[in-house]
Amino acid sequence: MSARKGKTERRTRETSVEILLNIDGTGKFDVECGIPFLKHMLETLSRYSEIDITLRAEGDNDHHIIEDVAITLGKALNSARGSAPIERMSTRTVAMDDAVVMTSIDIIDRPYAEIDCPDP
């Protein structure tokens, strides 16, 4: 099987984001985004998922950078997987250092879900 790699760029008036990733990597990362906590989270994602991530992001404020990194990361993951099947959803709970981490991921390609639930 060939390596599953994705490269995506996003440029707006507020941000510039470039991501290169390899789903079949070893967890190597090179992240420059100017936001220490976002960098930490992306490096942690890379390390534990073993997805190689190279990322460059800059922008006018943290909110726009985080938002556009998320959009670009999702597009790069979608591009990298190609037609190869991968799990769409996953939930994990992990004790890590002095915290319990709970996460759920759904990599469907839709911006939101709207559900009309009547009051009981």
Predicted feature locations:
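Structural preference for solvent-exposed beta-strand-turn elements
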Residues: 2-120
